[in-house]
Amino acid sequence: MNAQEIIRSIEAEQMKTQLPVLHIGDTVKVNVRIREGGKERIQAFEGTIISMARAGINRTVTVRRIFQGIGVERVFLVHSPRIESMTVTRLGKVRRAKLYYLRDRIGKATRVKQKITRKAN
């Protein structure tokens, strides 16, 4: 085994298997473990995915939300042990790979169209 194969095998052990299918424009709820002092609690962060980067264990997702009139963005490592769970609450319909233009929008203009899925008969 060479060094790359060893690294791949270690990374494969650390990767999460139970992940939802994520797409740009989806609204997701991310539950993150936060340590405050000696206590550990779970903090929820819900927002729209504006970008996804990298692959494998280094995959990141940038989530944006508006909190008290101010835009807040957080970058999450998808396979991090700090992430308790990730759930898709709403499917978005967009035609871009990066939604950085949402940073310049205010109010209702920041909404993303909802993807409507129909069941086949």
UniProtKB/Swiss-Prot annotation:
GO terms for cellular component: cytosolic large ribosomal subunit. Keywords: Ribonucleoprotein, Ribosomal protein. It comes from the Bacteria. GO terms for biological process: translation. Gene3D superfamilies: 2.30.30.790. It holds the Pfam family Ribosomal_L19. Belongs to the bacterial ribosomal protein bL19 family. NCBIfam families: rplS_bact. This protein is located at the 30S-50S ribosomal subunit interface and may play a role in the structure and function of the aminoacyl-tRNA binding site. This is Large ribosomal subunit protein bL19. It comes from Gloeobacter violaceus (strain ATCC 29082 / PCC 7421).
